[in-house]
Amino acid sequence: MNTRLEKFYKENVVPALMKEFGYTNPMEVPKLVKVTLNMGVGEAASNKKILENAVADMSKISGQKPVVTKSRVSVASFKIRDGWPIGCKTTLRRAKMYEFLDRLINISLPRVRDFRGVSGRSFDGRGNFNMGVKEQIIFPEIDFDAVDAIRGMDIAVTTTAKTDAEAKALLAAFKFPFRN
């Protein structure tokens, strides 16, 4: 079963990118590999309930249970010790990845206050895109009244593109709202 965005990729994005970059084979066209969501919750060291709420929020947003991340080293200034839970992350692939990106592009990003588009310079040099979200309440799955605290998250989109130009063209073909 193909999602709406996956069908759009096969019917519209692949032919457009083949024409733009001169690919001879459809398998050469860059594609999305995975979307990784990460939520760092530094306050979780002092209060375990905060981490439980963050995990619940992320599981609603992603549709799957996130993994709790633990600190690797003790840092006295942050008051954390080695092995303490300090965040959560989840990796979306295939259908869940396309469904999440569809919701992100068409529903969540337009709900951001004073939104002018995502930065076109957030590529890592190898064709992957990273962005941050300041509030988890932009996602429709989160009930605004039930939120205990406003938390942000990192979103990393991994592609098979070899250059940033190919990756930007791929995401722009998916109607990603780039600022520049």
Swiss-Prot record:
Gene Ontology biological-process annotations: translation
Keyword Isomerase among record annotations: no
Alphabetized GO MF terms: rRNA binding; structural constituent of ribosome; tRNA binding
PANTHER family hit by this protein: 60S RIBOSOMAL PROTEIN L11-RELATED
Full protein name: Large ribosomal subunit protein uL5
Pfam families in the record: Ribosomal_L5, Ribosomal_L5_C
Function per UniProt: This is one of the proteins that bind and probably mediate the attachment of the 5S RNA into the large ribosomal subunit, where it forms part of the central protuberance. In the 70S ribosome it contacts protein S13 of the 30S subunit (bridge B1b), connecting the 2 subunits; this bridge is implicated in subunit movement. Contacts the P site tRNA; the 5S rRNA and some of its associated proteins might help stabilize positioning of ribosome-bound tRNAs.
Assembly and oligomerization: Part of the 50S ribosomal subunit; part of the 5S rRNA/L5/L18/L25 subcomplex. Contacts the 5S rRNA and the P site tRNA. Forms a bridge to the 30S subunit in the 70S ribosome.
Keyword tags: Ribonucleoprotein, Ribosomal protein, RNA-binding, rRNA-binding, tRNA-binding
Similarity comment: family membership: Belongs to the universal ribosomal protein uL5 family.
Superkingdom, taxonomy of origin: Bacteria
Gene Ontology, cellular component aspect: ribonucleoprotein complex; ribosome
NCBIfam families (alphabetical): PRK00010.1 (NF000585)
Keyword Ligase on entry: no
Gene: rplE
InterPro entries attached to this UniProt entry: Ribosomal_uL5 (IPR002132), Ribosomal_uL5_bac-type (IPR020930), Ribosomal_uL5_C (IPR031309), Ribosomal_uL5_CS (IPR020929), Ribosomal_uL5_dom_sf (IPR022803), Ribosomal_uL5_N (IPR031310)
Organism encoding this protein: Xanthomonas oryzae pv. oryzae (strain KACC10331 / KXO85)
